[in-house]
């Protein structure tokens, strides 16, 4: 069963991520009074990127981007296989470093600046990422995803603060406003694309596929809050994921980009007040 879950994740996660990206573009366009692209536009974009000639800035960049993709795929595979969530999050953090190195491997000042901003974003959300694994252990007594989803009561009952912190840091992780410092998904915000400035053709396609794996992984972590031994918790978890993703899109469209100091301060304060306080309460009542 674990092998089936891993294979399904590896095959279906990019398609699910691309559909969510298409939904993001469509909803964002309607919020801005535009018609927007078709729902399948991300698939058309990938096909066009792969059809272009491979023009990487250097041979190292494509290797680092492939490493970024592979580590994200491995991290998600561990989550959907029911393995150790702590190991899953450690590998996820390692994947981020490959992206920073890929952006830093060329001489473009815009790409280098984007890589530096990405490092700041990692510093901002990483404490919440580690606290998340600790929170699941305090609430369920196990780091194993398979044990967490077999609990009689959903983890969100004991971890509402962690869920709020997760939703906050998810906006940073997915590089959505107001925390899209390293690169932007919207053309009206930034012509120069930060850490993806020198990525084009198949290299940019690999970057996009990696992001589709990442968004699926992040929503999988959201679903983990709502899953339990009751089969009815699965549709509830799916609905919760869609609601959370819609809230991220809404926040993305009503917010202006903040400066890096505001990013660090706000994220660390939210981490302390949500994950830190919730974790302290769980430690006291154990």
Locate each region found by the language model.
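Alpha-helical transmembrane segments of multi-pass membrane proteins predominantly involved
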Residues: 1-286
């Amino acid at each position: 069963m674990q092998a089936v879950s891993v294979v399904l994740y590896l095959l279906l996660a990019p398609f699910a991520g691309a559909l969510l990206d298409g939904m993001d573009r469509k909803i964002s366009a309607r919020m801005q009074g535009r018609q927007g692209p078709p729902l399948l536009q991300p698939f058309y974009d990938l096909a066009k990127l792969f059809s272009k000639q491979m023009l990487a800035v250097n041979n190292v960049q494509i290797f680092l981007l492939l490493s970024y993709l592979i580590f994200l795929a491995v991290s998600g595979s561990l989550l959907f296989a029911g393995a150790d969530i702590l190991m899953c999050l450690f590998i996820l953090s390692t994947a981020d470093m490959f992206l920073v190195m890929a952006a830093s491997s060329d001489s473009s000042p815009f790409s280098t600046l984007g890589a530096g901003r990405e490092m700041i974003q990692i510093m901002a959300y990483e404490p919440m990422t580690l606290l998340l694994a600790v929170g699941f252990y305090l609430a369920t007594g196990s780091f194993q995803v398979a044990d967490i989803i077999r609990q009689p009561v959903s983890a969100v009952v004991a971890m509402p603060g962690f869920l709020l912190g997760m939703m906050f840091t998810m906006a940073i992780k997915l590089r959505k406003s107001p925390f899209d410092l390293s690169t932007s998904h919207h053309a009206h915000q930034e012509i120069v694309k930060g850490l993806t400035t020198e990525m084009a053709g198949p290299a940019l396609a690999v970057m996009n596929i990696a992001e589709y794996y990442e968004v699926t992984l992040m929503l999988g972590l959201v679903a983990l809050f709502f899953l339990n031994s009751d089969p009815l918790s699965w549709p509830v978890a799916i609905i919760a994921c869609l609601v959370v993703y819609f809230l991220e899109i809404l926040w993305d469209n009503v917010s202006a980009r903040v400066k890096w100091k505001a990013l660090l301060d706000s994220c660390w304060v939210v981490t302390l007040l949500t994950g830190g306080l919730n974790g302290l309460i769980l430690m006291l009542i154990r």
